[in-house]
Amino acid sequence: MLFTIEQLELIKKLQHTGMSSDQLLKAFGELEVPEQLQNNNTIAAALYSPLLVQHLTTPKSETPVKLTVQTVPTPVKSEPQSSNCSSPFEHPICSNAPRPIRSQRTPMKEITTLDDPNELEEFMKQGEEACILDMKTFITQYSLRQTTVAMMTGVSQPYISKLLNGNHRELSLRCRKNIYCWYLNCRRHPNKLAAFLADPTTRLETNGDGELIPQRRERYVFRPILIRMLESFFTQTPFPDLPRRVEIANACNHVLKMDKKGVGLMPKEVVSPQVVSNWFANKRKELRRRSAEASAASTSSASSSASSTANHDSVSVSSMSPRDEETSSRNTTPETAISPSPAVSTFEVSRPSAIISATSSTTSPISIPATIIPSVSPSALELFAMAQQLGVQLPVPFPTLPTHFFPFQMAPFYGNPASILKSE
């Protein structure tokens, strides 16, 4: 038969008082007598506020000492019982009252026993994955610890963790049903959970209707000296294991005691390994966020500079006129490809003999404005255009034709040269 550490300590204390095994059996029998009484208030008080044997602290003697057990009822504020709840454990118990001596591996029958056994079957019909999800939401909403659930259900904490993580196949069906019954009972009767809660840091409360009030976990406030210490530890080991976290927590508590000049630390000031783990996780998350922001900023700056350069080039190209483009293309052409004729401001044009009057035997020079004269060698079409502006007809020979003249009449051409050239 296996015993817990607490049970072994109690057995040793009882042995030190000089009690025999028969006296122990008789004492346990006397403790079971109040459970058979009909007075519910007396039963609840006897279970919740038992007095230890008065000879536990007396020195060991050779003669057997008579065992006396005395139970004193604790003042309890009674509430009217509901129609569907007749258990004496329905009454809320004062938080400062002594709690019963109970093995941590023994399930609480009053919490794991349902009023209606069919309720468990109806609950499990939706599938165990959905059952675990509902129970996990309930535990997270009310900030319950896995150790508290393990103590109430009689299942060890690692198996509670496996169940909540979805590895329910590693637990026996009996253990799973026991946990499900605990969840259904606490969900239906929140005052049971508030009364039997053994973890003082959770501090569950109920409202006027007997429903649980969700509690927010208290945030740990780090002092500057702790932040400096944790920063130094983070540079050494960003991912500390459990022994390392325990070492860091002990070092932080030691520094806090020195900072308070030997004054004891309050419960909310004590640094636990879980607090260290949370701080390291938040620190790693902050570093990842900063790195992501820096990379995003560098990428956006590079893209903006590239887009501004492209816009500048497009503006420079679009600002050039067709004449500028032609001039720039001509300027980029080698000099050997173009043989411009020297610029002249005046030249003589001879009129045809048929058009010139008989009295005038010579032609007079004509002055052409400088704006009409192109800067490069003009083409034949440009020459005809200038001649039209000046009112002069030019019988220019066309070397590719046999007659060496243009194949159309000159008079219509000077009137509308575009239509003539288009028709031809």
UniProtKB/Swiss-Prot annotation:
Cellular component GO terms, alphabetical:
nucleus
Query: Which stretches are tagged as biased composition: Polar residues?
Result: 311-321, 329-345
Family affiliation: Belongs to the HMBOX1 homeobox family.
What exactly does this protein do? Transcriptional repressor which maintains cell fate asymmetry of AWC neurons in adults by repressing the expression of multiple AWC (OFF) genes, including srsx-3 in the AWC (ON) neuron.
Describe what happens without this gene: RNAi-mediated knockdown has little effect on srsx-3 expression in the AWC neuron.
Reported impact of H404Y:
In ky777; expression of G protein-coupled receptor (GPCR), srsx-3, in olfactory neuron AWC (OFF) is lost after larval stage L1, but expression of GPCR str-2 in AWC(ON) is retained
Q: Where is this region: Disordered?
A: 291-345
The alphabetized list of GO BP terms reads: positive regulation of DNA-templated transcription
Q: What is the lineage of its organism?
A: Eukaryota, Metazoa, Ecdysozoa, Nematoda, Chromadorea
Q: Which organism is it from?
A: Caenorhabditis elegans
Q: What is this protein called?
A: Homeobox-containing protein 1
Keyword Transcription appears in the UniProt entry:
yes
